Amino acid sequence: MAGATVPTVTTGGRPLRKSFVAAAAVVLIAGLGAVSTATADPPHNPGGPCIQPDQNVSLSSVAGYADVVQALDRIERTSKGLVSVSSAGTSGEGRELLYATVGDGPTTFWLHARIHGNELHSTEAVLQILDHLASGDPRARLIREQLTVIVIPMYNPDGAEANIRQSTTPNRIDLNRDWENFVQPESVAFWKLWRETAPELALDLHHMGEAPVVNGTNDLNQFQIGARSIAPSRMTAEQWLTNRQMAMVSVDALDRYGLANIAHYPLIDITNAALSRMLMGGTAPAGETPVTQSLTKGAIFYEVRSVGQKSNGQLERLFTIPTMAVLTAAADGTLGSYDVSGYDALPFATQGPCGE
């Protein structure tokens, strides 16, 4: 949601608690689609919507840090031992950097959300996915048997509480540009968790900060697939193939859903992003030894359109549907043979500031 003007909410550390009112967490999972503030749709071109500087935006239906603590506690307690919740460390403001582990399969899958604190709906989507992975659904059982899934619902809790993109203290920086210098405690903690868990596959959930249209159309682009956070020349052949396979599994799942108007994310080469260094290796926090490039074989990201309020549920499904598809393909073995011939034909989108 970069570039959008949104209100700042009050920050404040909350201690990690081990028991909560379960009903509140149920509301968190089931009710984030509710609208608490009614406002007219802002102007947009075409199709919007876009947040305007003077627009009243309610964050009451968006998962905050306390909601994440509560939801993870509920899921862990009701999972009958299938889910364990741990802390990778503490944020700059002292919040626990919480993650959940579900499954005990031989392949580790890393899933993180909200590395940018003001990209709101990925947290709720990840909590829904975790809740489902702890269920008796046959697909969930298969994933648990074949994968060990590391789930990080809120990578940047301080930024999320402040409703800003960056971290807050001791440095206000983009945490998705900190896997070379590691100046923030969040980056150090999650790098160590990545090294410890050695995920073969990784997925990072984001929101767009603009309202693009699919090239050659007037269709609002609602989902962008990011198969390359770095140039393919920086990846191994296996990594580049796996990234495209993960991308096409995601795209095909959303095509069946409809209305996503999918496009490529712009071609970038950002070496200090978290996923980039998962693929490349070669960097480490002070006092640590860098790992080799071969640790992670595939790492991609999603960009979903921003602004919920009247469409929270749809935005969350744009995350949950492709994520579950990739998890399933990784678990049932189809990912490794998935056809990537349609990847190059995916359109790009024309970026445009909201409301202009």
Report the location of each language-model feature.
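Secretory targeting and sorting signals
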Residues: 1-41
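C-terminal accessory segments enriched in acidic
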Residues: 18-21, 41-63, 196-199, 215-356
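Short glycine- and acidic-rich boundary segments immediately preceding or forming the N-terminal edge
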Residues: 41-93
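Solvent-exposed, polar/charged alpha-helical surfaces in well-ordered, non-transmembrane soluble domains
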Residues: 70-73, 124-131, 188, 192, ...
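Surface-exposed patches in mature extracellular/periplasmic domains of secreted proteins
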Residues: 84-89, 138-146, 259-267, 338-339
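A short loop-to-beta-strand scaffold at the N-terminal edge of the catalytic core in hydrolase folds
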Residues: 93-100
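Short glycine/proline-enriched loop/turn "hinge" motifs that connect secondary-structure elements
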Residues: 101-103, 165-168, 290-296
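Active-site/substrate-binding loop(s) of hydrolase catalytic cores
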Residues: 106-115, 120-245
